[in-house]
Protein backbone atom coordinates (compact mmCIF):
# COMPACT_ATOMS: atom_id res chain seq x y z
CA UNK A 1 0.00 0.00 0.00
CA UNK A 2 1.28 3.45 -0.88
CA UNK A 3 2.21 5.72 2.01
CA UNK A 4 0.33 8.95 1.37
CA UNK A 5 2.30 10.89 3.96
CA UNK A 6 5.96 9.99 3.50
CA UNK A 7 8.41 11.02 0.81
CA UNK A 8 11.17 8.77 -0.50
CA UNK A 9 14.45 10.58 -1.17
CA UNK A 10 16.75 8.73 -3.61
CA UNK A 11 20.44 9.58 -3.97
CA UNK A 12 23.62 7.73 -4.97
CA UNK A 13 25.12 7.70 -1.48
CA UNK A 14 24.46 8.62 2.15
CA UNK A 15 26.19 12.00 2.10
CA UNK A 16 23.04 14.12 2.48
CA UNK A 17 20.88 11.71 4.48
CA UNK A 18 21.44 13.33 7.86
CA UNK A 19 21.34 16.83 6.43
CA UNK A 20 17.89 16.30 4.89
CA UNK A 21 16.54 15.29 8.29
CA UNK A 22 18.27 18.29 9.89
CA UNK A 23 16.69 20.55 7.26
CA UNK A 24 13.24 19.27 8.13
CA UNK A 25 12.80 17.44 4.82
CA UNK A 26 11.14 14.42 6.32
CA UNK A 27 10.88 11.09 4.58
CA UNK A 28 12.57 7.79 3.95
CA UNK A 29 15.97 7.61 2.26
CA UNK A 30 17.29 5.22 -0.37
CA UNK A 31 21.02 5.19 -1.05
CA UNK A 32 21.26 3.86 -4.61
CA UNK A 33 25.04 3.85 -4.83
CA UNK A 34 25.66 1.33 -7.62
CA UNK A 35 28.32 3.04 -9.82
CA UNK A 36 26.37 2.62 -13.04
CA UNK A 37 29.33 3.92 -15.11
CA UNK A 38 31.41 0.95 -13.98
CA UNK A 39 31.11 -2.14 -16.16
CA UNK A 40 30.58 -4.64 -17.45
CA UNK A 41 26.93 -5.41 -16.71
CA UNK A 42 26.78 -9.19 -16.12
CA UNK A 43 24.10 -11.48 -17.49
CA UNK A 44 20.82 -11.17 -15.64
CA UNK A 45 20.90 -14.63 -14.06
CA UNK A 46 24.24 -13.82 -12.42
CA UNK A 47 23.56 -10.14 -12.10
CA UNK A 48 23.64 -9.44 -8.38
CA UNK A 49 26.61 -11.68 -7.57
CA UNK A 50 28.57 -10.46 -10.59
CA UNK A 51 27.85 -6.82 -9.93
CA UNK A 52 28.76 -7.13 -6.26
CA UNK A 53 32.02 -8.91 -7.13
CA UNK A 54 32.99 -6.17 -9.56
CA UNK A 55 32.20 -3.32 -7.17
CA UNK A 56 34.00 -5.06 -4.31
CA UNK A 57 37.09 -5.57 -6.47
CA UNK A 58 37.16 -1.96 -7.60
CA UNK A 59 36.31 -0.39 -4.24
CA UNK A 60 38.11 -2.75 -1.87
CA UNK A 61 34.95 -3.16 0.21
CA UNK A 62 33.94 -6.63 1.51
CA UNK A 63 31.95 -8.50 -1.13
CA UNK A 64 29.25 -9.84 1.25
CA UNK A 65 28.58 -6.29 2.48
CA UNK A 66 28.42 -4.94 -1.08
CA UNK A 67 26.09 -7.72 -2.18
CA UNK A 68 23.73 -7.23 0.77
CA UNK A 69 23.53 -3.45 0.32
CA UNK A 70 23.20 -3.69 -3.45
CA UNK A 71 20.44 -6.28 -3.20
CA UNK A 72 18.50 -4.17 -0.72
CA UNK A 73 18.92 -1.02 -2.82
CA UNK A 74 17.57 -2.67 -5.98
CA UNK A 75 14.73 -4.31 -4.08
CA UNK A 76 13.71 -0.97 -2.56
CA UNK A 77 14.03 0.76 -5.94
CA UNK A 78 11.73 -1.83 -7.53
CA UNK A 79 9.21 -1.42 -4.71
CA UNK A 80 9.33 2.38 -4.55
CA UNK A 81 6.57 3.22 -7.09
CA UNK A 82 4.17 0.91 -5.25
CA UNK A 83 5.16 2.00 -1.74
CA UNK A 84 5.24 5.80 -2.08
CA UNK A 85 3.12 8.55 -3.57
CA UNK A 86 5.99 11.03 -3.71
CA UNK A 87 9.61 10.29 -4.74
CA UNK A 88 12.34 12.93 -4.98
CA UNK A 89 15.60 12.25 -6.84
CA UNK A 90 18.71 14.15 -5.69
CA UNK A 91 21.42 13.94 -8.36
CA UNK A 92 24.05 16.50 -9.33
CA UNK A 93 25.79 17.00 -12.66
CA UNK A 94 28.74 14.58 -12.56
CA UNK A 95 29.08 11.17 -14.21
CA UNK A 96 28.50 9.13 -11.05
CA UNK A 97 25.19 10.89 -10.40
CA UNK A 98 24.01 11.16 -13.98
CA UNK A 99 24.70 7.48 -14.64
CA UNK A 100 22.79 6.52 -11.49
CA UNK A 101 19.98 8.88 -12.48
CA UNK A 102 19.47 7.28 -15.89
CA UNK A 103 19.53 3.84 -14.25
CA UNK A 104 16.72 4.94 -11.93
CA UNK A 105 14.77 6.56 -14.77
CA UNK A 106 15.11 3.45 -16.94
CA UNK A 107 13.72 1.41 -14.06
CA UNK A 108 10.78 3.76 -13.54
CA UNK A 109 10.06 3.94 -17.28
CA UNK A 110 9.08 0.26 -17.21
CA UNK A 111 6.39 0.90 -14.61
CA UNK A 112 2.80 1.94 -15.10
CA UNK A 113 0.98 4.23 -12.72
CA UNK A 114 4.04 6.05 -11.43
CA UNK A 115 3.57 8.24 -8.36
CA UNK A 116 4.77 11.84 -8.31
CA UNK A 117 8.50 11.64 -9.13
CA UNK A 118 10.51 14.86 -8.92
CA UNK A 119 14.13 15.77 -9.62
CA UNK A 120 16.55 18.13 -7.91
CA UNK A 121 19.69 18.44 -10.04
CA UNK A 122 22.27 21.25 -10.05
CA UNK A 123 25.77 21.93 -11.33
CA UNK A 124 26.58 24.98 -9.18
CA UNK A 125 25.62 26.74 -5.98
CA UNK A 126 26.00 30.40 -5.09
CA UNK A 127 29.01 31.04 -2.89
CA UNK A 128 30.80 27.77 -3.73
CA UNK A 129 33.67 28.46 -6.13
CA UNK A 130 34.21 24.86 -7.26
CA UNK A 131 31.00 22.92 -6.86
CA UNK A 132 31.65 19.19 -6.77
CA UNK A 133 28.40 17.83 -5.42
CA UNK A 134 25.41 18.03 -3.11
CA UNK A 135 27.46 16.62 -0.25
CA UNK A 136 29.22 19.99 0.02
CA UNK A 137 26.00 21.75 0.98
CA UNK A 138 24.72 22.45 4.48
CA UNK A 139 21.28 21.40 5.63
CA UNK A 140 20.01 24.93 5.06
CA UNK A 141 21.48 25.04 1.56
CA UNK A 142 19.83 21.72 0.70
CA UNK A 143 16.53 23.03 2.02
CA UNK A 144 16.81 26.00 -0.35
CA UNK A 145 16.76 23.56 -3.30
CA UNK A 146 13.46 21.98 -2.26
CA UNK A 147 11.21 24.57 -3.97
CA UNK A 148 13.19 24.09 -7.20
CA UNK A 149 12.31 20.43 -7.67
CA UNK A 150 10.64 19.57 -10.98
CA UNK A 151 8.40 16.69 -11.92
CA UNK A 152 9.95 14.00 -14.11
CA UNK A 153 8.56 14.03 -17.65
CA UNK A 154 8.01 11.29 -20.19
CA UNK A 155 10.84 12.76 -22.27
CA UNK A 156 13.20 12.37 -19.33
CA UNK A 157 12.11 8.77 -18.77
CA UNK A 158 12.67 8.00 -22.46
CA UNK A 159 16.09 9.68 -22.51
CA UNK A 160 17.10 7.89 -19.32
CA UNK A 161 16.14 4.55 -20.86
CA UNK A 162 18.14 5.22 -24.00
CA UNK A 163 21.16 6.47 -22.04
CA UNK A 164 21.15 3.42 -19.77
CA UNK A 165 21.17 1.12 -22.80
CA UNK A 166 24.03 3.11 -24.35
CA UNK A 167 26.11 2.93 -21.16
CA UNK A 168 25.82 -0.87 -21.18
CA UNK A 169 26.77 -1.27 -24.86
CA UNK A 170 29.96 -3.10 -25.86
CA UNK A 171 31.05 -0.24 -28.12
CA UNK A 172 30.85 3.57 -27.79
CA UNK A 173 28.73 3.86 -30.94
CA UNK A 174 25.35 4.01 -29.12
CA UNK A 175 26.76 6.70 -26.82
CA UNK A 176 28.01 8.68 -29.81
CA UNK A 177 24.58 8.42 -31.45
CA UNK A 178 22.94 9.57 -28.24
CA UNK A 179 25.33 12.51 -27.88
CA UNK A 180 24.42 13.65 -31.41
CA UNK A 181 20.73 13.76 -30.48
CA UNK A 182 18.61 16.23 -28.52
CA UNK A 183 19.48 15.69 -24.85
CA UNK A 184 18.02 18.87 -23.39
CA UNK A 185 15.54 16.91 -21.27
CA UNK A 186 18.45 16.06 -18.94
CA UNK A 187 20.72 19.11 -19.28
CA UNK A 188 23.78 17.71 -17.47
CA UNK A 189 23.80 14.29 -19.11
CA UNK A 190 25.70 15.20 -22.28
CA UNK A 191 28.76 16.58 -20.48
CA UNK A 192 28.75 13.63 -18.08
CA UNK A 193 28.71 11.08 -20.91
CA UNK A 194 31.48 12.95 -22.73
CA UNK A 195 33.51 12.69 -19.54
CA UNK A 196 32.71 8.97 -19.46
CA UNK A 197 34.14 8.49 -22.95
CA UNK A 198 37.30 10.32 -21.88
CA UNK A 199 38.05 7.29 -19.68
CA UNK A 200 38.73 5.35 -22.87
CA UNK A 201 42.40 5.19 -23.90
CA UNK A 202 43.28 8.35 -25.81
CA UNK A 203 44.63 8.37 -29.36
CA UNK A 204 47.58 10.48 -28.16
CA UNK A 205 49.13 8.15 -25.58
CA UNK A 206 46.77 5.28 -24.72
CA UNK A 207 46.01 6.73 -21.28
CA UNK A 208 42.60 7.62 -19.91
CA UNK A 209 42.04 11.14 -18.63
CA UNK A 210 42.25 9.98 -15.01
CA UNK A 211 45.44 8.03 -15.69
CA UNK A 212 47.06 11.00 -17.42
CA UNK A 213 46.09 13.41 -14.64
CA UNK A 214 47.59 10.97 -12.15
CA UNK A 215 50.93 10.82 -13.95
CA UNK A 216 51.01 14.58 -14.50
CA UNK A 217 50.44 15.23 -10.80
CA UNK A 218 53.23 12.82 -9.82
CA UNK A 219 55.61 14.42 -12.33
CA UNK A 220 55.90 17.31 -9.87
CA UNK A 221 57.07 14.98 -7.10
CA UNK A 222 55.95 12.07 -4.90
CA UNK A 223 52.52 12.24 -3.27
CA UNK A 224 50.51 10.06 -0.94
CA UNK A 225 47.38 8.52 -2.41
CA UNK A 226 45.26 10.98 -0.42
CA UNK A 227 47.27 13.93 -1.71
CA UNK A 228 47.09 12.57 -5.25
CA UNK A 229 43.32 12.17 -4.99
CA UNK A 230 42.94 15.76 -3.83
CA UNK A 231 45.22 17.07 -6.58
CA UNK A 232 43.56 15.18 -9.44
CA UNK A 233 39.91 15.02 -8.45
CA UNK A 234 39.58 18.30 -6.60
CA UNK A 235 41.82 20.47 -8.80
CA UNK A 236 42.71 18.96 -12.20
CA UNK A 237 39.69 16.99 -13.37
CA UNK A 238 37.26 19.14 -15.38
CA UNK A 239 34.29 17.07 -14.18
CA UNK A 240 35.36 14.86 -11.25
CA UNK A 241 33.13 11.92 -10.39
CA UNK A 242 35.19 9.30 -8.55
CA UNK A 243 35.33 8.83 -4.82
CA UNK A 244 38.63 7.96 -3.21
CA UNK A 245 38.10 4.17 -3.30
CA UNK A 246 37.37 4.06 -7.03
CA UNK A 247 40.23 6.46 -7.71
CA UNK A 248 42.55 4.15 -5.78
CA UNK A 249 41.47 1.25 -8.01
CA UNK A 250 42.66 3.22 -11.07
CA UNK A 251 46.00 3.97 -9.41
CA UNK A 252 46.32 0.37 -8.22
CA UNK A 253 46.00 -0.87 -11.80
CA UNK A 254 48.86 1.42 -12.82
CA UNK A 255 51.02 0.10 -9.98
CA UNK A 256 50.27 -3.58 -10.69
CA UNK A 257 50.78 -3.45 -14.47
CA UNK A 258 53.74 -5.39 -15.97
CA UNK A 259 55.49 -2.10 -16.83
CA UNK A 260 54.12 0.16 -14.12
CA UNK A 261 54.17 3.92 -14.66
CA UNK A 262 53.62 4.43 -10.92
CA UNK A 263 55.42 2.82 -7.98
CA UNK A 264 54.94 2.77 -4.21
CA UNK A 265 57.90 4.04 -2.21
CA UNK A 266 59.48 1.13 -0.34
CA UNK A 267 59.01 2.61 3.12
CA UNK A 268 55.23 2.91 2.76
CA UNK A 269 54.29 -0.39 1.10
CA UNK A 270 52.80 -1.72 4.34
CA UNK A 271 50.98 1.50 5.15
CA UNK A 272 47.23 1.93 4.80
CA UNK A 273 46.51 2.45 1.10
CA UNK A 274 45.67 6.15 1.42
CA UNK A 275 48.99 6.85 3.17
CA UNK A 276 51.22 5.11 0.65
CA UNK A 277 53.73 7.40 -1.04
CA UNK A 278 53.67 7.19 -4.84
CA UNK A 279 56.25 8.18 -7.39
CA UNK A 280 56.58 8.22 -11.16
CA UNK A 281 58.67 5.50 -12.85
CA UNK A 282 60.69 5.81 -16.09
CA UNK A 283 57.70 4.27 -17.90
CA UNK A 284 55.48 7.00 -16.48
CA UNK A 285 57.87 9.72 -17.61
CA UNK A 286 58.09 8.19 -21.09
CA UNK A 287 54.29 8.15 -21.33
CA UNK A 288 54.06 11.80 -20.33
CA UNK A 289 56.77 12.66 -22.83
CA UNK A 290 54.83 11.06 -25.68
CA UNK A 291 57.44 8.34 -26.22
CA UNK A 292 55.17 5.38 -25.40
CA UNK A 293 51.57 4.31 -25.96
CA UNK A 294 50.15 2.83 -22.77
CA UNK A 295 48.03 0.31 -24.66
CA UNK A 296 51.23 -1.16 -26.10
CA UNK A 297 52.69 -1.72 -22.60
CA UNK A 298 50.33 -4.51 -21.50
CA UNK A 299 48.09 -2.52 -19.13
CA UNK A 300 45.63 -4.44 -16.99
CA UNK A 301 42.28 -5.10 -18.64
CA UNK A 302 39.47 -2.79 -17.57
CA UNK A 303 36.00 -1.64 -18.57
CA UNK A 304 34.54 1.74 -19.46
CA UNK A 305 30.88 1.05 -18.85
CA UNK A 306 30.19 -1.89 -21.14
CA UNK A 307 33.25 -1.21 -23.33
CA UNK A 308 36.28 -3.46 -22.73
CA UNK A 309 39.71 -1.80 -22.83
CA UNK A 310 43.16 -3.32 -22.69
CA UNK A 311 44.97 -6.32 -24.21
CA UNK A 312 42.84 -8.30 -26.65
CA UNK A 313 39.96 -5.80 -26.70
CA UNK A 314 38.87 -3.78 -29.75
CA UNK A 315 41.03 -0.66 -29.71
CA UNK A 316 38.44 2.03 -29.05
CA UNK A 317 40.04 5.39 -28.28
CA UNK A 318 39.01 8.90 -27.34
CA UNK A 319 40.22 11.45 -29.89
CA UNK A 320 40.77 14.79 -28.10
CA UNK A 321 40.88 16.72 -31.38
CA UNK A 322 37.57 15.52 -32.78
CA UNK A 323 36.13 14.95 -29.28
CA UNK A 324 34.69 11.64 -30.41
CA UNK A 325 35.45 7.97 -29.86
CA UNK A 326 37.16 6.17 -32.72
CA UNK A 327 38.41 2.64 -33.31
CA UNK A 328 42.04 2.20 -34.29
CA UNK A 329 42.71 -0.46 -36.89
Please annotate each region the language model reported.
Residues 227-233:
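A short acidic, leucine-rich amphipathic alpha-helix
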Residues 60-110:
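Long, hydrophobic/aromatic-enriched structural stretches that serve as scaffold segments
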Amino acid sequence: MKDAQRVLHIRCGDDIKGKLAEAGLAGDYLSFADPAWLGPPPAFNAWLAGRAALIADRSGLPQPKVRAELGEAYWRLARAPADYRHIVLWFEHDLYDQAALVRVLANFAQRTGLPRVELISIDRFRGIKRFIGLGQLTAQQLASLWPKRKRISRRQLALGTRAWAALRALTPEPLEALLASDMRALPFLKAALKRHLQELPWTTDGLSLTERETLAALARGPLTVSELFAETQMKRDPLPFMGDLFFWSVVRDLIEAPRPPVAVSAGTRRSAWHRRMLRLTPTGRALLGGKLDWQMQQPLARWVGGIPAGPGAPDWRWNPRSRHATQLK
